[in-house]
Amino acid sequence: MGLRIKICGLRDPQQAIAIADLGATAIGFIAVRQSPRYVSPAQVAEIAQALQKTHPTVNRVGVFANATAEELEAYVAAGITSLQLHGDETLADSQRWRDRFPALELIKALRIRSTADLALAESFTDCVDTLLLDAYHPQMLGGTGATLDWQALQAFQPSRPWLLAGGLTPENITTALSQLHPAGIDLSSGVERSPGDKDLEKVTALFSSLARNSLLK
């Protein structure tokens, strides 16, 4: 399987289709009301329907933080195919959503401050399908533009696939992937003009950089 490429924080159906055209394997939707990239279930349904017609294999990821069952159900009904838990969800929370939504991919995101956080990440491998490592910020859950210490992550080899996030851009992606070998990458602020408004030139530059360095295989 090739590198998974998730572009997160979309709000516009045409941008979603254009980014899928460029080669994204997943589109992420922020279901956290405090986020400037927030989209309602109705907005997600509109984008999901458009993607289902043009790119049915592209994964549609709902990004949640300490969500209720009702919130998750609303976005699942809107057409998401993966649940990304990006808050302070515990192992018990993750197992509960695993049991409730067995057909959906379950991703647990962890905001990494130290190697102790990497050990915590590995503890989730029994109840989730995929891990995601993001940079820690005291006030923001994601989309901060801050990068991780890639060198410190080199020993991270969990038993589940993992995605690298945190301040990735078309300019630094090849450096990151020369040091690390995740199953996929997740970009948001590094390819946008403003929160929720993606810059298609930057997304194109991302794929060009990956292709030029033979990283799309």
Curated annotation (Swiss-Prot):
GO terms for biological process: L-tryptophan biosynthetic process. The keyword Acetylation does not apply. Pathway: Amino-acid biosynthesis; L-tryptophan biosynthesis; L-tryptophan from chorismate: step 3/5. SUPFAM superfamilies: Ribulose-phoshate binding barrel (SSF51366). InterPro entries: Aldolase_TIM (IPR013785), PRAI_dom (IPR001240), RibuloseP-bd_barrel (IPR011060), TrpF_fam (IPR044643). It catalyses: N-(5-phospho-beta-D-ribosyl)anthranilate = 1-(2-carboxyphenylamino)-1-deoxy-D-ribulose 5-phosphate. It comes from the Bacteria. One of its GO terms (molecular function) is phosphoribosylanthranilate isomerase activity. Keywords: Amino-acid biosynthesis, Aromatic amino acid biosynthesis, Isomerase, Tryptophan biosynthesis. Its EC number is 5.3.1.24. The keyword Amino-acid biosynthesis applies. Pfam families: PRAI (PF00697). PANTHER family: N-(5'-PHOSPHORIBOSYL)ANTHRANILATE ISOMERASE. NCBIfam families: PRK01222.1-4. Belongs to the TrpF family. This is N-(5'-phosphoribosyl)anthranilate isomerase. It comes from Synechococcus sp. (strain ATCC 27144 / PCC 6301 / SAUG 1402/1). The lineage of its organism: Bacteria, Bacillati, Cyanobacteriota, Cyanophyceae, Synechococcales.
